[in-house]
Amino acid sequence: MTVQMEYEKDVKVAALDGKKIAVIGYGSQGHAHAQNLRDSGRDVIIGVRPGKSFDKAKEDGFDTYTVVEATKLADVIMILAPDEIQQELYEAEIAPNLEAGNAVGFAHGFNIHFEFIKVPADVDVFMCAPKGPGHLVRRTYEEGFGVPALYAVYQDATGNAKNIAMDWCKGVGAARVGLLETTYKEETEEDLFGEQAVLCGGLTALIEAGFEVLTEAGYAPELAYFEVLHEMKLIVDLIYEGGFKKMRQSISNTAEYGDYVSGPRVITEQVKENMKAVLADIQNGKFANDFVNDYKAGRPKLTAYREQAANLEIEKVGAELRKAMPFVGKNDDDAFKIYN
């Protein structure tokens, strides 16, 4: 199925005009949505628990409230807290303060699609999901364009939910470069699959396996790091800019020939079957339930995974090599952290 890209000219209704907007959470996506909407002339307040995000929102000039207060004041409530805390946040502080005719939005369909959050039938439920991290959503807006976004409607109580979703996307700058309509099911399942099988899980496992093959064969860890990790950005940038075609036009004939000959030996039909199993666990809710249950138990699995990953040899080698490469950029964890 193909979908048609939409732009600012296709946003026919200024559905957010006269609406009080509450952005719940002021982390990676929250600060970007809030600041872009404010700069687009919208009436935005912040709802967040006390802490660094609360202080930062006030410092940035927003009227900042508790989540309960912000929900009571708002017509449109966008929940941009981390996925794992949204259910308890919604049930304790948002749901009791919703009114008929309100709209509730998300930037990812996780909690709605898997029914961890159930919104009353008299409230709209929409989505605006920019295809990029918050700092990029903000920076590109300030530069005069934006990041493409997906939009969706899960529940249309007022008949205006699609207009709200599209106008929100316009307000954050996404309609300048393109909007795609989707569903909560499609966005959630595709997003999780992309993260797990390719962009995060698949990629890091591939890099680590390549590093281990080289070092176990007696090659220097530092050289292995450059070959399987450091040069990854160069290749990904070419694919990002012009697809496989541009990448293959830009590399040597030797590298291109090796691409065709050896790629299928690594990513075999069995790997594809494994990917299908990953997708099945997403579709049937197994991954979602495992993730949420781990959070409710205090994150024992996630903590163990993080500790294991931090002790990988490739991480230790990379940390030392990057000290001599200031051109790779400052390692600023706070720039990407989601608080509260």
UniProtKB/Swiss-Prot annotation:
Ordered alphabetically, the record's keywords are: Amino-acid biosynthesis, Branched-chain amino acid biosynthesis, Magnesium, Metal-binding, NADP, Oxidoreductase
According to its UniProt record, this protein's enzyme class is oxidoreductase
Catalytic machinery residues? H108
- Cite the source lineage: Bacteria, Bacillati, Bacillota, Bacilli, Lactobacillales
- The entry marks the following residues as binding Mg(2+) 1, namely D191, E195
Please list the residues that bind NADP(+). Y26, G27, S28, Q29, R49, S53, D83, E84, I85, Q86, G134
In which family does this protein belong, per the annotation?
A: Belongs to the ketol-acid reductoisomerase family.
Which source organism?
Answer: Streptococcus pneumoniae (strain Hungary19A-6)
Q: Which GO terms describe its cellular component?
A: cytosol
Gene encoding the protein: ilvC
Q: Which reaction does it catalyse?
A: (2R)-2,3-dihydroxy-3-methylbutanoate + NADP(+) = (2S)-2-acetolactate + NADPH + H(+); (2R,3R)-2,3-dihydroxy-3-methylpentanoate + NADP(+) = (S)-2-ethyl-2-hydroxy-3-oxobutanoate + NADPH + H(+)
The record's Gene3D superfamilies line, in alphabetical order, gives: 6.10.240.10, NAD(P)-binding Rossmann-like Domain
Q: What is this protein called?
A: Ketol-acid reductoisomerase (NADP(+))
